[in-house]
Amino acid sequence: MEVTAIKNSSKYIIAIHNNTNGEFSAKSFNNYSHAAKVYISKSKDPDDFFIVTQLPDFIFFKRHNQNVVLQSKSAADDGSLSIYCQKNRIPYINVEAQYGHKKQQILMLLICQKLLSGAGK
């Protein structure tokens, strides 16, 4: 597959990742140059969060009371997929959940589906 095959701004790349309790969370991005905006819900575990590259997606997840981080456009290129997507204007969402939070991660994926289907905007 050629890399150019994914350079379509109407298609999203969704990454799914797990973390360990307290090691990596939405709080990790407070006062961090990689984050343009951070929203942490008072009712959600900060270990379960989204990383997005587009402001409308940040607003969508915030409006749905989900922990969400908007990656900064000036974030250093560390070779990550999110940086690649942002530089190439490919919408990107990382669904990050604590290991063992399978139910929460499934709910997060359903919220992604809602975003992608245009429902709830």
Question: How should each PLM-predicted stretch be described?
Answer:
Residues 1-121:
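Structured catalytic-domain cores with a bias toward divalent-metal coordination
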